[in-house]
Amino acid sequence: MSPVWAADEAPEAFIQRITHETLETIKADKSLRNGDMTKIIQLVDAKLMPHVNFRRMTALATGPAWRKATPEQQKRLQDEFKILLVRTYSGALSQVSDQMVVVKPLRAGQENKNLVVSTEVRGKGDPIQLDYRLEKTPGEGAGWMIFDLNVLGVWLIENYRTQFTKEINAGGIDALVASLAARNKTNAKAP
């Protein structure tokens, strides 16, 4: 896909494309279908993560403390948060079998810097509401970037912001980074 096409892609088409490509890749690969976490993490990193604005996501989740953090603290926090999110999303994808994603029409009047695309994941059981908050990026490599997710009515940023604020208030940014690193280390050992 050329960057020009990506820049002109409608937000619903963007979400439909990346979710469809990811689900089809899983359905076509037996080791992915069987929950091979190493391969699923590689898939998430290759197919989804290039479309996520981790800097904005981390800054929003961290709140006012983000602006007070040094560039090194910001980088470490962003790196650890990315690992956590990749593992979380990969864990959800390891459960994929016959699901399909239905992208709902956009609500009118949304702006390109904070636009919500609503989807429904359908398969066995009740459908799961999954919304993506997007921003349009300008310039070279322009296109849509995800900076928040809403799963079953809970926005990811709000959820982590509550957790992060408690950790920052208790021990500062370094304590939050250490906590995320410890959680990531524990999660890496889990099957």
Regions found by a protein language model. Name each.
Residues 16, 23-25, 78, 102, ...:
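Soluble periplasmic/extracytoplasmic beta-strand elements of cell-envelope proteins
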